[in-house]
């Protein structure tokens, strides 16, 4: 069975939140591994918006599947392979029914969007 999640985020909204709440926002939404990437590579609001949209889309797919009742954003890590392709890692949560988890992220300077396919 396949489940999908989709999300779109205004980059300006994430920029405002990041500017106002910087570390609080990062610590509430992103894992330690994700925060390290943001800080080491000096990533901007466009990058954060894409990752945030991917987390939202992943959460929607997971919740619609019924395999979880709730999941935190920090538990959904959006990381990148060496070739730059994004992937989802559930930060140590083992969901035995998950066969595959695919994510695609796109953005402009105005919007970021993500689409996720969860296969059980």
Regions found by a protein language model. Give the residues of each.
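Core catalytic alpha/beta fold that binds nucleotide/phospho-ligands
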Residues: 1-120
């Amino acid at each position: 069975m396949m489940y999908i999640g989709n999300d779109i985020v205004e980059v300006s909204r994430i920029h405002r939140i990041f500017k106002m709440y910087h570390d609080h926002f990062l610590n509430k939404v992103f894992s330690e591994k994700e925060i390290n990437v943001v800080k080491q590579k000096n990533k901007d609001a466009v990058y954060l918006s894409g990752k945030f949209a991917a987390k939202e889309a992943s959460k929607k797919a997971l919740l619609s599947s019924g395999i979880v009742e709730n999941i935190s954003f920090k538990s959904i890590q959006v990381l990148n392979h060496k070739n730059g392709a994004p992937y989802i890692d559930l930060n140590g949560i083992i969901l035995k029914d998950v066969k595959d988890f695919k994510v695609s992220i796109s953005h402009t300077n105005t919007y970021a969007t993500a689409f996720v396919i969860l296969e059980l």
